[in-house]
A protein has these predicted regions:
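Cytosolic-side membrane-entry/anchor segment at the start of a transmembrane helix
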Residues: 1-41
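Alpha-helical transmembrane segments of integral membrane proteins
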Residues: 44-151
Length: 151
């Protein structure tokens, strides 16, 4: 595959991944706003515990999404620095082959570590979102039961 096709596929992949992450962040923000709107006139009670757990789950989902984006940014920067080192144009590494080899290896290790963290945070962003949604549904069912039995 020519370099242009590889670059274009990589660009498309990054775009899709970023859009997905931002979509999940927006869903979480909307879910929290919806929960706040539903409970604006409510008083605290034990029946709200599942809602509190849902909000915590959504907060953790938001945190994981933000951390994922931070690691993506850091990885892109590390890739940029790796290319500069390998081309011999990095101001600190220069063209010294030993320094270039050592710097390249260190940067590759950092990229691999970042990639693992990106995967970790991406998985947990989704998991916490779903957990929050499940606890929200549990809370909603409890509220419906309480309204039914209070009639």
């Amino acid at each position: 595959m020519p370099d242009k096709e590889i670059i274009e596929l990589h660009r498309q992949l990054r775009t899709v991944q970023d859009k997905y992450t931002y979509f999940l962040l927006a869903v979480v923000a909307a879910a929290v706003a919806f929960a706040v709107k539903l409970t604006i006139d409510s008083t605290l009670s034990f029946s709200m515990i599942p809602l509190g757990v849902a909000i915590i789950g959504w907060g953790l989902s938001f945190f994981c999404g933000c951390r994922q984006l931070n690691y993506v940014s850091s990885t892109i920067y590390a890739n940029y620095e790796l290319l500069r080192v390998q081309k011999g144009i990095h101001p600190e590494a220069g063209a010294n082959t030993q320094i270039v080899a050592a710097a390249s290896e260190g940067i590759r290790q950092a990229i691999e570590s970042n990639s693992n963290k990106i995967s970790f945070f991406a998985k947990w962003q989704f998991r916490f979102l779903i957990a929050g949604a499940l606890f929200f549904v549990v809370w909603h069912i409890i509220e419906m039961i309480m309204r039914t039995t209070n009639k």
